[in-house]
Amino acid sequence: YAKLNESFSFNYRKNKVNFFSTLGFNSRKNFQDLNIQRKFIESSTKEVKSNFEQLSRIRDDGKSHNAKLGMDYFASKKTTLGVVFSGFYNPGKFGNHSDVMIYDPAMSLLSQTLASTSNDRKWKGFSTNLNLRHVFDSTGRELTVDVDYLTYRSKNSQDLINAYYDAHGLPTIKADTLLGSLPQDINIYTAKMDYTHPLN
């Protein structure tokens, strides 16, 4: 599959104000095909008891959208104020379809299991940063302040289905179905202040 990774940056300064922004987009698809064969052997006679074969087709499709917008205000030669907004949105899908066949030693089909797994995910986040930097003098004395707010939201839907059949393609037992929903909500608040005072 083709992959795409693009970004755009912009910076503009006039007088005491500096604006900057970045936009990014990423698209990717991956695949994996597996063909697994096993023989089960009787330890005492070394004869083949049964044969196992698994065919799996795995597909993963994901995208990423990123954006950042910020501004610096140079209040004076010693003091700078800033604000930054950033966010991302990453949707994606994953699928795994497997056929599992069990054969006798003569390679006659005994049973078959069809397994299907799908995952639909959406992950997004947003952050805000307020910052201040003040230089007291030329000796290196400096004060910096940062206040941040970050939020993350995730929705993850999962489906797992296993169906069981005999050698004639007739269901042997009821299919297993497992449905999952895994949401996440995260909020983070931080603040810090640093003061630098050189000793010499």
Regions found by a protein language model. Give the residues of each.
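Generic signature of intrinsically disordered, low-complexity, basic-rich segments
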Residues: 75, 109-111
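Membrane-proximal, glycine/serine-rich, low-complexity loop/turn segments characteristic
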Residues: 1-97, 117-152, 189, 194-200
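Extracellular loop and loop/strand-boundary signature of outer-membrane beta-barrel proteins
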Residues: 52-57, 111-118, 174-181
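Outer-membrane beta-barrel transmembrane domain signature of Gram-negative proteins
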Residues: 172-200
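Outer-membrane beta-barrel translocator domains and adjoining extracellular loop/strand segments
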Residues: 32-48, 94-109, 156-166, 170-172
